[in-house]
Amino acid sequence: MKNRIVFLDYLRVIACLMVMVVHACEPFYLNDEGTFFASRWNALWATWIDSAVRACVPLFVMASAYLLFPVTQPTGAFFRRRLVRVALPFALWTCIYTARFDGDWGKLLFNFPADIIGGHLWFVPMLLGLYLLMPLLSPWAEKASEKEVRGWLAVWAFTTVFPYLRGLWGHLYGAPSFGAVPYLYGECPWNAFGTFQYVSGFFGYMLLGFWFRKFAGEISWSRTLAVAAPLWGVGYLAVAVPFLLRIPDAAGYPVAAPYATAVSLETSWEFCSAGVALTVVAYFLVIRKLTADGAFYRRVIRPLAEASYGTYLMHMLVLAEVCDLLKPRLTAPLAIGATALVSFVVASLLSMALRRIPRVGHWLCG
């Protein structure tokens, strides 16, 4: 217990449950044909609830950075540990999802199985990409001053408004003359790597986790809430309002549209957008105050946290079945909450049970 960072266990559990909530919301604005809102009621609840938990993935990234960055061990040893604990379970579950849902095995040579119930696996390749970056940036991080880190965080913060800038372009000038989306600052069909490519995206959350570890001092609960509450409020509005206002419901409900409509609606929900980033900081500020390590922590939180990677990897196998059972029987908010909670409990118990199997358990669940 002495070397364990207790609040990160609380964070893993909370973020993992948030992921379940995000995926429990999806059937209320998506179906097999594309975008679908059955009613205004469903649209409102899906928006209100999902917008509150978009911080889930960035919180996982910050937890990894808080623990691992800067890297203090030899690069080879660092990569070998990540290979066994992260990449191997990902590879095995990728195969499990592909087999379970009759996916195309050939596509696995190019990407994770995004076209079946396995889209949530995108998180792991992204995280592995950050792991590739960590040893490269560690010498700089060890020597960087707080002012320098804040400067880079400011640059990254500017990139979090890009989703809104793309929308502004569309509002001012209409559809781009070439390409699927408006390009910004050096991006074009023959160059996907614009000016801010290397200081944008989840890199910022990695840097933010490092900043909290090295430079953020302890503050009281009252001050924490005084800072976190307005950050969360502003961020939540920036996430929820654009989604809700852009639902194409002029002709009434139900609303049926191509899948691309949902992708467009989710612009303000993007994990690296400004609104989500504000809620991430707010959540992290509050969660790092959770340091109680008594019986509840030892018997509930820590086991759930240790099993959380396996829970994440397998949860869609459980959630899809639970959703099919509960969605027709409950109203939207109850169905979302119950689906998320039941899926979290079942997947966590399965992950904890699998982890008890010698060797194989860690291959599957990290």
Name what the model sees in each region.
Residues M1-G366:
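Alpha-helical transmembrane segments and their immediate juxtamembrane cytosolic regions
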